UniProtKB/Swiss-Prot annotation:
Pfam families, A to Z: Rhomboid
Location in or out of the cell: Mitochondrion inner membrane
Enzyme class: hydrolase
Species this chain originates from: Danio rerio (Zebrafish)
Segments crossing the lipid bilayer: 84-104, 169-189, 220-240, 246-266, 272-292, 299-319, 335-355
Residues covered by region (Disordered): 35-75
Predominant location category: mitochondrion
UniProt transit peptide range: 1-37
UniProt-recorded name of the protein: Presenilin-associated rhomboid-like protein A, mitochondrial
Keyword Kinase: no
Molecular-function GO term, any one: serine-type endopeptidase activity
Compositionally biased residues, Pro residues: 66-75
Catalysed reactions listed for this entry: Cleaves type-1 transmembrane domains using a catalytic dyad composed of serine and histidine that are contributed by different transmembrane domains
This protein's GO CC annotations: mitochondrial inner membrane
């Protein structure tokens, strides 16, 4: 009996040692995600799913590591889109209203300036000989450094004068985007920029970033590509709409495209921040391609390839639709698509519904200016 008890004891010890090795290798092979942030839990609380056969052999002394839980989708709150919707409608209306007033004031100022320049031209003709002698003597009294500075300023002025009105307008937009890009490199400002210069439907601040995010780029390449496209189409869009109407379309396109992005993110539960001028630029690009569909476009690095503006717009819209359907997340395809559709709608219907019916607003503004005592307009009078 003694030899029998010794044999049973030796068999039991070997069985326990062999079974204690199995769950360790099973946990490392089946559940490597344990290294991704979960703390070690006690062995009795481990799941049964991965090692049911091992439990039968080990008598329940060892269990598998629980699988990583799937994070729940963020809650969908459509009621949070009400304020962005009201802001979008109000901002768009105010943008085109302000553009109509600015265009009215600009025309008055240009007319008055042309009259004054005609008077000065007659006066300068009489004093031309005296002025030439005076400026010649003044130039000879300058040092070489002063002359170089004046020549540099003159070259910059000549370059600026050679730009089209659209390029001059876009230069200001590029400058604003460059300033914001530099601010992103300042660590102390990043929290402020994330709050106000990135659009996110899950954020507490949802309305103001709909405008400011259109002037925000974190990547240099992202900004350079967007600003190059905007520069390319600036002359065409401003010649078609005018400077003031272009600015209203650009700003409104940014807000509307952001709102479309809000709707898509809320509907799908894929909440996250976005930034960039792509929505506004897609509005401008779509407006030009809709107005001049036969225009020829090309690729910078492939000048041999050319295609019509209408086909280019169709390809871009199809690409964004594919991005939405397939769930691509590298770009905000919802914002791109929203901006493009707004540009197409404005050229087809919006220009007639909004811009051509601005006369009552202009008349009201004209009467309001004339009612202000002692406040002459840019041209000096109220008429």
């Amino acid at each position: 009996m003694a030899w029998r008890s010794c044999f049973m004891k030796w068999t039991q010890i070997n069985s326990i040692n062999a079974s204690s090795l199995c769950p360790k290798s099973t946990r490392l092979n089946i559940h490597p995600q344990q290294r991704c942030g979960f703390r070690k839990t006690e062995r009795p609380s481990e799941s049964k799913k991965g090692v049911q056969e091992t439990e039968a052999e080990a008598g329940g002394h060892n269990r598998a590591v629980p699988p990583k839980p799937v994070p729940p989708l963020p809650p969908r709150r459509p009621h949070q889109l009400f304020r962005p919707l009201v802001f979008t409608v109000g901002f768009t209306g105010c943008s085109f209203g302000a553009a109509a007033i600015l265009q009215y004031e600009s025309v008055k100022s240009r007319v008055q300036l042309a009259i004054e320049e005609a008077k000065e031209e007659k006066r300068d003709t009489l004093l031309e000989g005296h002025d030439t002698t005076y400026w010649h003597n003044w130039w000879n009294q300058l040092s070489n450094f002063q002359k170089q500075v004046i020549l540099l300023i003159s070259a910059v002025d000549d370059f600026w004068s050679g730009l089209s009105e659209g390029q001059k307008t876009v230069t200001g937009i590029i400058a604003l985007n460059t300033v914001v890009l530099c601010c992103w490199r300042v660590p102390a400002m990043q929290r402020f920029l994330v709050k106000y210069f990135t659009s996110n439907p899950a954020s507490k601040t949802r309305c103001l970033p709909m405008v400011l995010s259109s002037f925000s780029h974190y990547s240099v390449i992202h900004m350079v590509v967007n600003m190059y496209v905007l520069w390319t189409f600036s002359s065409s869009i401003v010649s078609l709409l005018g400077r003031e109407q272009f600015l209203a379309l650009y700003l409104s396109g940014g807000v509307i495209s952001t709102f479309v992005s809000y709707v898509f993110k809320t509907a799908t539960g894929r909440l996250g921040p976005s930034l960039g001028a792509s929505g506004s630029i897609m509005t401008v690009l779509a407006a030009v391609c809709t107005k001049i569909p036969e225009a020829k476009l090309g690729i910078v690095l492939l000048p041999v390839i050319s295609f019509s503006a209408g086909n280019a717009l169709k390809a871009l819209v199809a690409l964004d639709i594919a991005g939405l359907v397939l769930g691509w997340r590298f770009f905000d395809h919802a914002a791109h698509l929203g901006g493009a559709l707004f540009g197409v709608w404005y050229i087809g219907y919006g220009h007639e519904l909004i811009w051509r019916k601005r006369e009552p607003l202009i008349k009201f503004w004209h009467e309001l200016r004339n009612m202000s005592p002692g406040r002459p307009g840019p041209g000096g009078g109220g008429g």
